[in-house]
Amino acid sequence: MILRKILENLTYNFLQINMSLKVFFVSIFLFSLSIFSNITIEISRGTEEPPRIAIVPFLYDDQSISYLLTNQISDNLSLFGEFEIIANSDLIAFPSSPEDFFYNDWKTLDIDYVVAGFISLEEDTSKFIVNYFLFDIRQGRNLLNGTARSSADSLVLSSHKMSNRIYKQITGVDGIFTTKLMYILNPEKDKYQLNICDINGDNEITLFDSPEPIMSPDWSPDGKKISYVSFENGNSEIFIQDLSSGKRNSLRMYPGINSAPVWSTNGNYLAFVSSRSGNPDVYLYDLKTEKISRITAHYGIDTEPSFSANGRKLLFTSNRSGTPQLYEVSLITRKISRITFDGNYNARGRYFPDGKNIVFVHRSEEKFHISIKRLGKSGLKMLTETTLDESPSVSPNNN
């Protein structure tokens, strides 16, 4: 029990150090397959009005199929507050192809884009063929002619893929609507669940459940495996689980603290935290040879490692300066540099893929905000105005 409390304090960013707050955390981990719930996120508009887009119900005899697809596309495109979706009741026409689309009809609604399409059934395979189109009203041109072939069971996935193409065509940025979220639930006393779901909270699946705490889940780079910490055997153990087979393996660990596993970008290593030498330090685990290398050695608490995109550096949290701050260590030279200097609490850092920026939790006036910082530059930028923000991670499209 004492060890569990120590580890919980460690993993959750030193929130019990120099504090008397009790904080509830929600950790969400993202992975893209190219491949909650009940959490409502309210996003307000910025200073610029978002593009207005109409999603016309696709032409098909079975309206339930049509509305399943178009409603899902509408929900996806409105998920981040980047678009204003026009209500179906405000539509002035219901085109299904470029041949029956008239741009002047839509200019009266002050609309930027229209999505329309039609569905047919492939009789020999019973698969749906979805032809969909994206029209730019301002420029008066057809931006996208897309075709999706889908079974009835995969219509939702197809709608996510269509949303990705539409989103990228408009913004120039890859869509992330096929992304999966991984998170831990504690629905009742002595019950913990490690779950994944679609980015909108649908299709929830429990990967592992236990009467003992589960912590620190992380995706492998290829999305085929996950790592996490479980207390199921009375001690903190790091497990790797294969998502297709469900097979679980416990890594060779010492008694004491074993926490915060994170995958390297090539999938060959896990960085993690262990107290095997008497104090929590960062270690590297070679998944092929099972060799363990010590990365940091300090009397302070080192935790929450994160790999840079090139795999040559680790970002980690340490209180070696007296308060939780972010540090960077070269895996080649073992040289350690302090990264953050603003305030007395900066933790849970993650690199952006460009290697030039990091995102992390910053405390200001006893409030916790998601912030970003450019490496090598002074200062930071707070992204959120709420008070108990935790566990940031970068989206698969780096946006």
Regions found by a protein language model. Name each.
Residues 181, 226, 267-270, 311-315, ...:
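Hydrophobic beta-strand positions that form the internal "hydrophobic ladder"
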Residues 174, 185-193, 211-212, 229-237, ...:
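A flexible loop/linker signature enriched in serine peptidases of the S9 family
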